[in-house]
C-alpha cells in the first residue's frame, strides 16, 4: 500500500467536496506536510490558485477574495505556526461574515506532544472563532469515503458566515508516484464525481419573517442607520429612506451616497441630537459602524423600537437597545417591508449637514490627510472600487467625504485591526478584476509590507496611497498622556516607502501637491499595474483638522 498515494486520494475527496459549495478561489502557502492537499488542489481544474509565502497575508488575501466573490474561499497551509498565522483573518471573517475554509495540514497523532519537529496541538487551537471545527483522522481506508465527504458537506452546508477549520493529519511518506492504492475506496462515491451537487444537502437557514406591524411603524418618525452592506443594497437603502422621509445616517461602508454627509461632524451639534430625539423608531441596516459621534448617539438614543437588520447572526448592538434583531439579507428585507411615500420630518439635520460640508470644503486646499479624505471621491477610478484602511484614515473619510451611491467600498471593520490590509486589498482586486484605489496609513503599510509581493500580480490598475503621518496619529484624538504619547502610542518610525516599492519592482511616486497627485493618478489608471503613492503629511494635521471642524460644526 502506498501511503502517499492514499493521502492524495483522501485529499482529493476533500477538495472536490469544497467545489460543491461554491469554492473557486484557493490560497496556498508553501509547505511539505500540506503536499497531499496542495497537489489535490493543483489537479482540480475547478480552482483558481493563489500563492503567497506568508500565511498571515495569505489568510487576508483569502478574506479579500471572499469579500468580493461572496463565496467561500479555501486556504491550505502546512503544520505548526503556519496555522496560527491564519488567526487574524479568521477572527475578522467571523465578525464581518466572509466564509473561509482553513485546511491545515498536521502531523499524525503519534507525533504530537513528543518533541517532534513542527508539531503543535492544532485541533481546537482557534477556540470559538470558527463556525465549525473538524479534526479529521489520519487517512485510512477503514473509514468510508462517504463519511469524509458528508462530514465536509455538513460543515459547509450549514455555514452562513465565518470560518471552518478542517485539520488534516497526514503521515509520511508525503511524496511518491500515484498508484491504484485507494482507487476502489474513492470509486465507492459512484457518480458523485461526475455530479456537481453535495453528497449531503442541508436545509436552507430560516431567516426572520416579515414584521406584521411594519405598516404601523412606517407611518412614524423614523431614522435609518446604514452600516456595512453591498453597493447594490446601499442604493436600495438610500431610495427606501428617501421615500419614507426618514433621515439616513450613512456609514463610510454603507455605499448609500450619504445623503446627509459629514454625519460624524453634525452629530456633535446639540440641534441635531435634539431633533433625533423625536424619532419613534430606528432601523439599522448593516453593522460595523465607524463614526465616534454616531456610536455615541446610537448608545444614548431611546426610541420606542430599535431594529437591526443584518445577514450576520448575533446581537450586533453594543448599546443593548430594546427592539428586534432581524437576521435577513438587507435587499430581501427591504422588499418585504416596502416604504410608503411621506414628507421628511427632520428640518435641522439637512441644514446642518449642508453647513458641515461647506465647512469641510472651505479648508480643502491645504495638502494634508484630512483634505485627502474629503477629496477621495474625486480620485475614484471609473467602474472601480475603494479599499479603506483602518485607524485614522477610515474615520477621516467617514467624517469628511461623500462617496457616490452604489460605488463599491471594502474594509476590515470587524475587529478593525491594521494587520493584513494590503493583503486584503490584493484579494479584493483579484476577485473583482476592477481598478482599485486602496488607502492606508504608514504603520498599516509597514505591518503588511511583504504583501507588496501580492500587488505585483494585478489584473487592472491598482493604486495604493500610503498616508505617511509618521505613526499612529489616531492616538492624538484620544486623551493619551502627552508625556508618553510619542514613545508608547504614536511610535513614529521615520521611514519612507520608496525602497520598499523598488524591492518589489512597483512604480512609486511622492507628490508634493494636489496637481502632482492628480497627474500621477491619471497616469496610473491607464495601465494594469500597481502604483504606490506615498503622501507625506504633517504629523498631527489630520487629527487637528478633524477636531477643529468638530468644534466649528458643534456651534452652528
From Swiss-Prot:
Keywords: Magnesium, Manganese, Menaquinone biosynthesis, Metal-binding, Thiamine pyrophosphate, Transferase. Pathway: Quinol/quinone metabolism; 1,4-dihydroxy-2-naphthoate biosynthesis; 1,4-dihydroxy-2-naphthoate from chorismate: step 2/7; Quinol/quinone metabolism; menaquinone biosynthesis. Its EC number is 2.2.1.9. Catalyzes the thiamine diphosphate-dependent decarboxylation of 2-oxoglutarate and the subsequent addition of the resulting succinic semialdehyde-thiamine pyrophosphate anion to isochorismate to yield 2-succinyl-5-enolpyruvyl-6-hydroxy-3-cyclohexene-1-carboxylate (SEPHCHC). HAMAP family: MenD. Homodimer. This is 2-succinyl-5-enolpyruvyl-6-hydroxy-3-cyclohexene-1-carboxylate synthase. The lineage of its organism: Bacteria, Pseudomonadati, Pseudomonadota, Gammaproteobacteria, Enterobacterales. The gene is menD.
Amino acid at each position: 500500500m502506498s501511503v502517499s498515494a492514499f493521502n492524495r486520494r483522501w485529499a482529493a475527496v476533500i477538495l472536490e467536496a469544497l467545489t460543491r459549495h461554491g469554492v473557486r478561489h484557493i490560497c496556498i502557502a508553501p509547505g511539505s506536510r500540506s503536499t497531499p492537499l496542495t497537489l489535490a488542489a493543483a489537479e482540480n481544474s475547478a480552482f483558481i490558485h493563489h500563492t503567497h509565502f506568508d500565511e498571515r497575508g495569505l489568510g487576508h488575501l483569502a478574506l479579500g477574495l471572499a469579500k468580493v466573490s461572496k463565496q467561500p474561499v479555501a486556504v491550505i497551509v502546512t503544520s505548526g505556526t503556519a496555522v496560527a498565522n491564519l488567526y487574524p483573518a479568521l477572527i475578522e471573517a467571523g465578525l464581518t461574515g466572509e466564509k473561509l475554509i482553513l485546511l491545515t495540514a498536521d502531523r499524525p497523532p503519534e507525533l504530537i506532544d513528543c518533541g517532534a519537529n513542527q508539531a503543535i496541538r492544532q485541533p481546537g487551537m482557534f477556540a470559538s472563532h470558527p463556525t465549525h471545527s473538524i479534526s479529521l483522522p489520519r487517512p485510512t481506508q477503514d473509514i468510508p469515503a462517504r463519511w469524509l465527504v458528508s462530514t465536509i458537506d455538513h460543515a459547509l452546508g450549514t455555514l452562513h458566515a465565518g470560518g471552518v477549520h478542517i485539520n488534516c493529519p497526514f503521515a509520511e511518506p508525503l511524496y511518491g508516484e500515484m498508484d491504484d492504492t485507494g482507487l476502489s475506496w474513492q470509486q465507492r462515491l459512484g457518480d458523485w464525481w461526475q455530479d456537481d451537487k453535495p453528497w449531503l444537502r442541508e436545509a436552507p437557514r430560516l431567516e426572520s419573517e416579515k414584521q406584521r406591524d411594519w405598516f404601523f411603524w412606517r407611518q412614524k418618525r423614523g431614522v435609518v442607520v446604514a452600516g456595512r452592506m453591498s453597493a447594490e443594497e446601499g442604493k436600495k437603502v438610500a431610495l427606501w429612506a428617501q421615500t419614507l422621509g426618514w433621515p439616513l445616517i450613512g456609514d463610510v461602508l454603507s455605499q448609500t451616497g450619504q445623503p446627509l454627509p459629514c454625519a460624524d461632524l453634525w452629530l456633535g451639534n446639540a440641534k441635531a441630537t435634539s431633533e433625533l430625539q423625536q424619532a419613534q423608531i430606528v432601523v439599522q441596516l448593516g453593522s460595523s459602524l465607524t463614526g465616534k459621534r454616531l456610536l455615541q448617539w446610537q448608545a444614548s438614543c431611546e426610541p420606542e423600537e430599535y431594529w437591526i437588520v443584518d445577514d450576520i447572526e448575533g446581537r450586533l448592538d453594543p448599546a443593548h437597545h430594546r427592539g428586534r434583531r432581524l437576521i435577513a439579507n438587507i435587499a430581501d428585507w427591504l422588499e418585504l417591508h416596502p416604504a410608503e411615500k411621506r414628507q421628511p420630518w427632520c428640518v435641522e439635520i439637512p441644514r446642518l449637514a449642508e453647513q458641515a460640508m461647506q465647512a469641510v470644503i472651505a479648508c480643502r486646499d491645504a495638502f494634508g490627510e484630512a483634505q485627502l479624505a474629503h477629496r477621495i471621491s474625486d480620485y475614484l477610478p471609473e467602474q472601480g472600487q475603494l479599499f479603506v484602511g483602518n485607524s485614522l484614515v477610515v474615520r477621516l473619510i467617514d467624517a469628511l467625504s461623500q462617496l457616490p451611491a452604489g460605488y463599491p467600498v471594502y474594509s476590515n471593520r470587524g475587529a478593525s485591526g491594521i494587520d493584513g490590509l494590503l493583503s486584503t486589498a490584493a484579494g479584493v482586486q483579484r476577485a473583482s478584476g476592477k481598478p482599485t484605489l486602496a488607502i492606508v496609513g504608514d504603520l498599516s503599510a509597514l505591518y503588511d509590507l511583504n504583501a507588496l509581493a501580492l500587488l505585483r500580480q494585478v489584473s487592472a490598475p491598482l493604486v495604493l496611497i500610503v498616508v505617511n503621518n509618521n505613526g499612529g496619529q489616531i492616538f492624538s484624538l484620544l486623551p493619551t498622556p502627552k508625556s508618553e504619547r510619542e514613545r508608547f502610542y504614536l511610535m513614529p518610525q521615520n521611514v519612507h516607502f520608496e525602497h520598499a516599492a523598488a524591492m518589489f519592482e512597483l512604480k512609486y511616486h511622492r507628490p508634493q501637491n494636489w496637481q502632482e497627485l492628480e497627474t500621477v493618478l491619471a497616469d496610473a489608471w491607464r495601465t494594469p499595474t500597481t502604483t504606490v503613492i506615498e503622501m507625506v503629511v504633517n504629523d498631527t494635521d489630520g487629527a487637528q483638522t478633524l477636531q477643529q471642524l468638530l468644534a466649528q460644526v458643534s456651534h452652528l
